[in-house]
């Protein structure tokens, strides 16, 4: 059979969307307003049956990398459905097989300008595989208070096998802090907003996907069609380190990030804009 590149890019000219800096230089966007007006994250988690206390084993960042620079014990949210949600700063979670309908807004501290913000609280595996601080002497001042960990004021998230019917967006970090403000998309993660998307209609659950999209106000779909990902200043990793071509992250539309790393089996149809 004909081989296929693990990462592909392509879009027809009529699909290209014109972007301006005004769309992402302020945090008071249409996307954030939608998330602010929605049911709180904690309430939506409770509605989905609640968090049962499950966490990952110390998980490497980047995920699957032998050269990890930090580790996280992530709370795991599995098989949950969120509708227009703001993910609070400090969540640092793994979302597994979750659905995000509408806007998913990631909250973080925008004024992360301290030179050591990336490193304060960073951990590594020490003797016996026990987590230990990588830089135990480092602290950071936040609003006049000294802290030994910046993870509660940041957001490092992994979405595995999730479905986004809308836009993934977030506060804009004023400095590129990829150890702390990072989004990783792994597994069969999907983004759709067009109810007539040919790729979506080929999915086994196409009827459900299309029904949810058609249930949205058309004006909302048009707004979210401007960008499937609005994460200026963020580090975004798309795809998997392994070579398993049965798992593929599919992105479409305009993707706005601080820096995006596409690896493994990823399929991107649209425009990439890094800030």
Task: Report the location of each language-model feature.
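Core solenoid repeat modules with strong leucine/isoleucine-rich periodicity
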Residues: 2-10, 15-21
């Amino acid at each position: 059979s004909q081989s296929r590149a693990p990462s592909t890019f392509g879009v027809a000219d009529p699909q290209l969307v014109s972007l301006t800096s005004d769309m992402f230089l302020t945090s008071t966007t249409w996307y954030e307003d939608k998330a602010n007006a929605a049911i709180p994250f904690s309430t939506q988690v409770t509605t989905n049956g609640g968090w049962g206390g499950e966490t990952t084993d110390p998980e490497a960042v980047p995920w699957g990398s032998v050269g990890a620079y930090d580790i996280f014990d992530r709370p795991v949210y599995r098989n949950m459905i969120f509708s227009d949600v703001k993910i609070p700063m400090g969540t640092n979670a793994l979302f597994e097989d979750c659905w995000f309908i509408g806007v998913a807004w990631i909250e973080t501290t925008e004024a992360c300008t301290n030179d050591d913000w990336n490193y304060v609280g960073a951990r590594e595996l020490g003797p016996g595989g026990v987590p230990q601080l990588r830089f135990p002497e480092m602290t950071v001042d936040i609003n006049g208070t000294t802290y030994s960990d910046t993870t509660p004021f940041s957001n490092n998230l992994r979405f595995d096998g999730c479905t986004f019917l809308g836009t993934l967006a977030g506060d804009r970090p004023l400095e590129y802090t990829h150890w702390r403000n990072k989004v990783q998309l792994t597994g069969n993660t999907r983004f759709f907003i067009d109810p007539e998307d040919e790729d979506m209609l080929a999915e086994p659950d196409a009827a459900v996907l299309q029904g949810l999209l058609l249930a949205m106000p058309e004006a909302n779909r048009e707004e979210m069609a401007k960008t499937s990902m609005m994460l200026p200043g963020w580090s975004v990793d798309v795809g998997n380190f392994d070579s398993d071509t049965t798992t593929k992250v599919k992105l479409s539309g305009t993707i706005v990030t601080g820096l995006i790393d596409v690896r493994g089996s990823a399929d991107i149809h649209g425009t990439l804009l890094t800030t």
